[in-house]
Amino acid sequence: MSGRGKGGKGLGKGGAKRHRKILRDNIQGITKPAIRRLARRGGVKRISGLIYEETRSVLKVFLENVIRDAVTYTEHAKRKTVTSLDVVYALKRQGRTLYGFGG
């Protein structure tokens, strides 16, 4: 093996990167009806118009924190793939234990 570390499948010299879609305002993908459905599931009857943007910003911060912790677990284990257990442990670390996905 030529010093490529674990699972050295690296053939060639890297080459050109494929086209990648530029990620910009993906938080708008959480649509107004989707937020309404989540609120309905939580027992909400009427929703103020200002709620939607606020919900998106709170959700974005929450996901950033969970993903940051999950990626930290992944990097510590010297992996490149985030597993469901990484997410479970990240949620547990934040005091939001999730059952049903192992661990």
From Swiss-Prot:
Intracellular or extracellular location(s): Nucleus; Chromosome
Any GO molecular function: protein heterodimerization activity
Record family assignment: Belongs to the histone H4 family.
Disulfide bonds: none
DNA-binding region: 17-21
Subunit description: The nucleosome is a histone octamer containing two molecules each of H2A, H2B, H3 and H4 assembled in one H3-H4 heterotetramer and two H2A-H2B heterodimers. The octamer wraps approximately 147 bp of DNA.
Post-translational modification N6-methyllysine, affected residues: K6, K9, K13
Primary localisation category: nucleus
Keyword Nucleotide-binding: no
Nucleus is among the record's keywords: yes
GO cellular component: nucleosome; nucleus
PTM remark: Glutarylation at Lys-92 (H4K91glu) destabilizes nucleosomes by promoting dissociation of the H2A-H2B dimers from nucleosomes.
Pfam family, one: CENP-T_C
Protein name: Histone H4
Purpose: Core component of nucleosome. Nucleosomes wrap and compact DNA into chromatin, limiting DNA accessibility to the cellular machineries which require DNA as a template. Histones thereby play a central role in transcription regulation, DNA repair, DNA replication and chromosomal stability. DNA accessibility is regulated via a complex set of post-translational modifications of histones, also called histone code, and nucleosome remodeling.
Post-translational modification N6-glutaryllysine, affected residues: K92
N6-acetyl-N6-methyllysine modification, residue list: K6, K13
Keyword terms, alphabetized: Acetylation, Chromosome, DNA-binding, Methylation, Nucleosome core, Nucleus
